[in-house]
Amino acid sequence: MYLSVSTAISKCTVLTGFVLLCFILSACSSSEKSITAEQATVEYDLLYTLPEENISFKGEVQPILENRCVVCHGCYDAPCQLKLTSAEGIHRGSNKEKVYDAARLTAAKPTRLFIDAMTTEEWRQKDFKPVLNEGDVNKVRNLENSVMYRMLRQKQLYPQARTGMLSDDFDVTLDRAQTCPTLDEFDDYAAKHPKGGMPYAMPNLSRKEHTTLVHWLAQGAPIPDDDVPSKVAEKQIKQWETLLNNGTGNTSDNKTSLVARYLYEHLFQAHLHFEGTDDREFYRLVRSSTAPGKPVEVIATRRPYNDPAKKVYYRITRHQGSIVAKTHMVYELSGKRMQRFEELFYDAEYEVTSLPSYEPDMASNPIKAFAAIPVSSRYKFLLDEARFFIEGFIKGPVCRGQTALSVIEDQFWVVFFDPDADIMPLKDDFLNKTANYLASPAELEDNFKLLASKTHYKTLIEKYFQSKVAAVKNNGPVDIRDAMNYIWKGGGKNPNAALTIFRHLDSASVNFGFIGDYPETAWVIDYSVLERIHYLLVAGYDVYGNLGHQLNARLYMDFLRTEGEDYFLTLLPAEKRQLIRDEWYQGIRKSDRNIAGVDLWMNMEFVSGYKTGNPQRELYQQLERYLGPLAGDGDYINRCRDEGCQPKASKNVIRADKAMQRATKMEGLVVKILPDVAFVRVKMGGKPENDIAYTMISNKAYHSVTSMFQHESLHDRRDYRNDTQTVVRWLEGSYPDFFYVVEIDDIENFVDGYNAIENRKDYEQFVARYGQRRTSEDFWKHADWFNQQYAREQPRLSGIFDLNRYQNR
């Protein structure tokens, strides 16, 4: 001991006084390296337990990836473009460039998985960096050289808090700056961002989950071959590929080609499901340079209607990887569907004398491009699965919908004109004459012509309005009950006849029936509106596009929304129509007032026979009666308080429903404190699968929506006093913002506490009792339950929820 003291003194400046000496000794000793400074990069204790046989990817690894990783790395907005939904996504790796960049002046090169590159080497040429070991292969190197492993280990070294909110150094905002370290950059990243391990800003993996992933990575991340079509699907694929490429035998080559092109441009993002196959077995329709019977070689174009530059074969290939809710849109193919297509497209009498070009002004305008196909056939095809096509612009590859969704209300109802109704906008002659007026900015692709575009397309819309006015100016009004015959009734059995759309800030969802209280607005959609929405925001929308492309799409969507809402207004008395229209928006529609033809259209009397002073409510009720069961069951929780609306269910379910009825009374200023979409698990006291789920949806009211660039609180001139709540007994939406968990015997107290919220402090106290924060030790257990519950509710339509928007509350 003396020797060590004297040695220390010799190395330090000697000062008088025993206390000072001790202080100096302490200071000197602190200069020694930390015992953990040079610890091993890998966890050797886990390597000692490495099994000889390969870890099963599908049986052991994939479930962990789906439940803990894909929940944030599943869509285009996955951090660092690291999509963990498939083997190809894992091998592709990460990229520092953001897909969503609303301010870029030039379009980015697309990086769509399974489309824009097919091999790992091709992705490296597109500047994607590996997250797995691609060097010397052994179990140690497989971990040392794996960014994925290093991220997992970083979380184990620096676990997050297990109570309360996350600290401010966790940035969970969508537009946060992303750091995407390569292997060479990882040590610096770990030093600067010690809490940046994975899962980021979420609870740690369990020891078992972590060990399984580490063992798999140490083994070299073995992944099985891609799934192949099942025997049941193989036969149907041959039949469908024959139909699409060869027709029925009685159709001309031109007719076959035009119909196949039309179907592809509408189904290119569908998850196809074949009759008789497993509920979770899906396929994709692609354009290939190879004929049926040969391996598919996808023709990659930026948009589905771009020139393929080579002979096209329409092929069906197995969907690979995990199914995420945000991009999961199912389209059923069956013998019955094939008969329907033959009836609408192949057996219908019409001639195709020539095929439309792939030039943008033609290809982006389906009214012109497919004029040879009868409007009735096209419209009935869209109506058969109207929800699917509406979903196209609020789901699909556009994982963030600021562009399209910032111009729609938070809750509204949608119905459609009957395809057999004798109205001008559904007639072939009228649409063919006005087709040039129905061009959209999709034809501009990525050309930046913002102001010129607005003026140009406004002029076209004016001409279209004037054409409609001229066509109906001599028509007299019809009784409101007779006017119902203009509305599509879905043949009395198709649930697509009535839809409800919910907007959740920059995402949305659509469901069958009239859901929620009577909405502020509604749409009536005709063929051209539905078709133009698809070509503007699905077929023609490019998430890699530039500022001009995104702004032009938003501006034109204003016109389409207005057209659908104005059709609804035409079913109201003219004397009330303009007043109602003005109340809907004080700002968003000011620019519409000077569109030539709108005022005249608004003043024309189309209906008569209203009996109350609230014609809008009366119209909603007329639609409910007319559509019957297709409009829904009256919505016992949100709208109908009569016992006749009460669903058949157990006493405890009815008890929960009645309690949730009171939660729908939450309205006004306090709603802004609440999450956009909150999932509620009501524990029924038995098995987990017997618990029930609710979704609490905040419906925000707006004076106007003015910009697509800034956060809502900065740019939306909100009408907070008219905010409302909708509650449904199922899981609605793809991006839950928060989870609540409550016992059935506490359900009344839950709602009482919810309704008592008046400020942020009240809400935090409510969350402390019922909420599942990002720090909760039970967070993953409940997140798993909600995904499992969704699968129970919708065995075929469900997908993995995305937790990118989960709040830190």
Regions found by a protein language model. Name each.
Residues 28-809:
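Aromatic- and Gly/Pro-enriched helix-to-coil junctions and flexible linker segments
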Residues 13-26:
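Bacterial N-terminal signal peptides
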